[in-house]
């Protein structure tokens, strides 16, 4: 017996053949997410994971954002970038918020905690409570629903143990978004010069920080920030 197509002689041909068959069988009713798949050919999946085995620790967030730092453009190829399952578990509040922020700035959101209350493998109460706290922030979720990957502000500046960009931006028709991560153990504070990020301060009418809902302070073209250990913030600036 023979179970192969003799006309296929390369790995790329085999990948195309198999994925074309899978896509046809799935139809338009199934969302296809590739994990550690080749970047190309790309036309068979709706999304592709930009990093794998990222959990809830800060160094995992740093690792995931390293992948986005250099793979942000892939949401121009696939419909969505996948930042891996977002796990909170027993990590700190700051780590939880930062990990959820990775989903917001990637444009794709999939909770990784076990939330089941019945069965042979029941989830933990702490995971259930944290999801109700951190996965339902409407301002943050509105960023997720944009379905867009932020771009690194400075591609040549990296930090943290996994060497990631810490500052990302996104422009939409009516707003600018800035995401800032603190991968370090200490407080990060200072000012961001909006012009350096390609944002004309004269076009801004105001803004908020999405996690807290606090107003953003922009003075003389600079945005003030104060990020506690392992904290991430998302600044939503309104266009005039």
Regions found by a protein language model. Give the residues of each.
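An acidic- and aromatic-residue-enriched active-site/binding cleft used to recognize and process polar
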Residues: 1, 35-39, 183
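The substrate-binding groove and active-site-proximal loops of carbohydrate-active enzymes
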Residues: 1-12
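Glycan-recognition surfaces
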Residues: 10-121
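Generic recognition of flexible, low-complexity loop/linker segments
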Residues: 20-22, 91-92, 99, 164-169, ...
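Glycan-recognition and catalytic regions of carbohydrate-active enzymes
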Residues: 78-87, 112-186, 200, 215
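Hydrophobic, well-ordered secondary-structure elements that form the walls
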Residues: 105, 178, 207-208, 230
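Beta-strand-rich binding/interaction modules
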Residues: 187-212
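C-terminal beta-strand-rich structural cap/linker in extracellular carbohydrate-active enzymes
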Residues: 218-240
